[in-house]
Amino acid sequence: MSEANLNRTLSGKVVSDKMNKTITVLVERKVKHPLYGKIMVRSKKYHVHDEANEFHTGDVVVIEECRPLSKTKAWRVVKLMQKAEQVS
């Protein structure tokens, strides 16, 4: 069994790029309330490894799980889905 197929992937929006080689990605998911059936938005922030400091706030990225890189960082960026809009 190959380990490459076992890594989980998520997509989310970069909300912070102030750390060196680390970005914070906000991942949102929709869940149905078990009793009332209302669709709710749940979110979680992940610290993600960005080796070249190439991703910035507002970018939409795909991340995948990897070995622990620090106390709070166990995800890395796979690819850029959408670049943030530049406001001039």
Swiss-Prot record:
Regions annotated as coiled coil: none
Annotated GO CC locations: cytosolic small ribosomal subunit
BP-aspect Gene Ontology terms: translation
MF GO annotations: rRNA binding; structural constituent of ribosome
Keywords associated with the record: Ribonucleoprotein, Ribosomal protein, RNA-binding, rRNA-binding
Summary of the function given for this chain in its UniProt record: One of the primary rRNA binding proteins, it binds specifically to the 5'-end of 16S ribosomal RNA.
Entry's family note: Belongs to the universal ribosomal protein uS17 family.
HAMAP family: Ribosomal_uS17_B (MF_01345_B)
Binding partners and assembly: Part of the 30S ribosomal subunit.
UniProt-recorded name of the protein: Small ribosomal subunit protein uS17
Source species of the chain: Nitrosospira multiformis (strain ATCC 25196 / NCIMB 11849 / C 71)
